[in-house]
Amino acid sequence: MNTDDYSNTENSVDASHQPRVNLSYVNEAIQTETVVRRSLLYRLTQIFRLGQMHALSGLKALIAAMFVLAYPAMVIAGHKLNDSAVEFGDARHWSAPEIGVASTLIARELDGPGWISDKHEWHPQARLTALPAWQESLLSALSDHGQLLLDLLADERDPDLITAVRLLDASATHKTTDRLLAANEAFARYDDRVAGGVTRAPTGEDALIARLITSAQWAEREYSQLAAISTPGDGWLASSDSIEAVYKAKAVAHVTHAMLDAVADREQNMLAKLGVTETMSDALNAWETAARMRPLFIANHGTGSVTGTSHPAIMALHFDQSRLAVLKVAAQIEAARQERIATPSGPASVVVAQGTGKGT
């Protein structure tokens, strides 16, 4: 046996006698610990994610609840109806006061609540009933009054006034806000032309009588519409039909009162000479009563109901009184004119009396 064989034999014997260690349980323990750690981490992660999901769901629910509760409040807050008296600021002097009234009323709506018909359907103000009815009728009344001015001017119609009245037409396809801004610019140009003597505004007795008679026709129209709404025996509290009818009529009264008040202020000397100052004041008070009507809730109950209150019927009564009041002014003006025509002027009669020596 050589040396190499001996070495190999020794190595094989030593290898066979070396102890064999089973490390499988160690590996299993490590693997188990890893699995446990991973499982715990996974569970913690899942718990955290679940908590996040619940928190997010709760936040969404809270936001939704806040929105549901806040939306009605936003709807109520959006009801910004400005029915205060029209007052001209110091920024501009209006040579034609009626044009100033129209421009001021338009600007108040645009600068205040904005034009509701231009709002998106989801907007809180789009859910309102009274304010859209008010604005729709306000625009219609301004358009009617603008057309009246054009009729009074006849062949002297100003192109800027024609443009403004056309822009007030509700049948126009352009956005209402854009049309009203353009109309106000046209009104301002027309008023500048009146101030410069290039064109004129309707004044005098004939123009005043025409305004009074036309306003009486408007009052009769509104009376008929309100009477038709209030004829049923019973009605819902704050029904949409009743609300729209009352606030549309209210807008007509507001515009008519403001326009007649502006004319009366400009023509106060003429009214005094005609002896109708007090009668005109009564007519303005009648229109103002209709314009100021603003109950907390609109009711349209028949006489057989518990309250028996019908705001459309009450408004109709105000319009009938306004109609009679303006017709009385017109009749007195016409009577004064006829008396003036039939009676010789004062100074001329004095001269005749002095010449004959029979002064009276």
What spans do the regions from the language model cover?
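Short, charged/polar, low-complexity loop and linker segments
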Residues: 115-127, 196-199, 228-241, 299-307
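Hydrophobic membrane-insertion alpha-helices, especially the h-region
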Residues: 59-75
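Extended amphipathic alpha-helical interaction segments
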Residues: 180-292
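Short, well-ordered, aromatic-rich surface patches in folded extracellular/luminal domains
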Residues: 170-210, 309-333
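N-terminal targeting leaders characterized by basic, low-complexity, disordered sequences
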Residues: 1-37
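Juxtamembrane low-complexity tails/linkers enriched in Ser/Thr-Pro and polybasic
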Residues: 40-53
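A cross-kingdom marker for long, charged
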Residues: 2, 89-90, 261-360
